[in-house]
């Protein structure tokens, strides 16, 4: 069911590829990245203040790091880094683990932590038209037996996306947003070992409007995913049934995240493609929807 709920413009950020929105309750602020610009953005809800920091590599996905005030774990071009903001508008980046990319021209893409603080992130070939199945999905955790390690869990993907976890952490979601795939999978997830199993098709997005991009899970266990190219954000029940679709005034919503004091605002980042934007002048902006449900706090990385 498509609803006519009005999306509110939060910020006309003009991001080339706005991704990985994360709400920080301690700051009452929304963070996100602009991948090709190598930038981390922050918007304070109370004041509307907008800050930007620029790094040395493309910045694709972020998750807050527990016990390290102001620090993030980030998936970038060459691997995982711990990043922090500097007063001069730059990002300090300390390497954690390098990624064994299958070919040149790859970077990290979508990523987040599970409920236990393990970091999950996928890699992709930036030349999407090539449709090379060289993408991997990695898990990073501190292993008491083998030490901290970045290990591939899935291979032969094109554009891994849509990572999310159910409220109890026992279901993991993953998609491939390439036009040739457009599928969301669900897995049973062992919260003790961080091992997914029982892979099954959760939603085949090919008959639906939009390619599956970034995602979030609400407190009811429903799965929200941006319908890239369709200007929609879809909500699916835990059984994979389409519950509703909310419109945003851009063609390429990229990822969504719940935030606000009550976690009842759904923030949506977007992509600003090249070419004529007369029909979507706000492309690359950040939007807010109030869908009448609450989200969950974003898990922190625990390493």
Model feature map: region roles:
Residues 187, 203-241:
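Loop/turn-rich, solvent-exposed surfaces of beta-rich toroidal or solenoidal domains
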Residues 90-153:
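Hydrophobic alpha-helical segments and helix pairs
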Residues 24-25, 30-35, 72-78, 119-131, ...:
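Conserved beta-strand positions in repeat-built beta-propeller and related beta-rich domains
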Residues 84-89, 142-145, 186-195, 291-296:
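Short loop/turn segments immediately following beta-strands, especially the blade-tip
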Residues 13-27, 56-75, 101-118, 154-171, ...:
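Beta-rich, blade/repeat-based domains predominating
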Residues 258-303:
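Blade-level signature of beta-propeller repeat domains, shared across WD40, Kelch, NHL, RCC1
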Residues 6-12, 48-54, 94-101, 148-155, ...:
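A short beta-strand motif characteristic of beta-propeller blades
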Residues 39-41, 79, 135-138, 183-185, ...:
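A short loop-to-beta-strand structural motif that recurs across blades of beta-propeller domains
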């Amino acid at each position: 069911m498509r609803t006519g709920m009005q999306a509110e413009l939060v910020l006309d950020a003009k991001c080339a590829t706005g991704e990985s929105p994360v709400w920080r309750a301690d700051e009452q602020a929304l963070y996100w990245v602009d991948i090709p610009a190598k930038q981390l953005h922050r918007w304070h809800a109370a004041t509307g203040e907008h800050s930007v920091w620029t790094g040395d590599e493309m910045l694709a996905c972020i998750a807050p790091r527990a016990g390290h005030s102001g620090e993030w774990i980030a998936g970038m071009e060459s691997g995982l880094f711990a990043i922090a903001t500097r007063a001069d508008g730059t990002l300090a980046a300390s390497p954690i683990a390098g990624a064994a990319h299958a070919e040149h021209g790859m970077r990290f893409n979508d990523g987040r932590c599970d409920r236990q603080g393990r970091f999950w992130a996928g890699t992709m070939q930036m030349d999407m038209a090539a449709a090379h199945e060289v993408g991997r999905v990695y898990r990073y955790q501190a292993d008491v037996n083998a030490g901290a390690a970045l290990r591939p869990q899935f291979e032969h993907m094109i554009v891994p996306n849509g990572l999310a976890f159910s409220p109890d952490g026992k279901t993991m979601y993953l998609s491939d947003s390439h036009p040739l795939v457009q599928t969301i999978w669900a897995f049973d997830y062992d919260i003790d070992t961080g091992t997914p199993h029982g892979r099954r098709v959760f939603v085949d997005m090919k008959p639906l409007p939009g390619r599956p991009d970034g995602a979030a899970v609400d407190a009811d266990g429903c799965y929200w995913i941006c319908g890239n190219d369709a200007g929609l954000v879809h909500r699916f029940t835990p059984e994979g049934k389409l519950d509703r679709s909310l419109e945003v005034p851009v063609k390429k919503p990229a990822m969504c995240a719940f935030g606000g004091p009550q976690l009842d605002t759904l923030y949506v980042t977007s992509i600003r493609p090249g070419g004529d934007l007369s029909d979507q002048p706000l492309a690359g902006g950040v939007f807010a929807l109030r869908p009448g449900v609450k989200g969950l706090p974003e898990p922190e990385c625990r390493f």
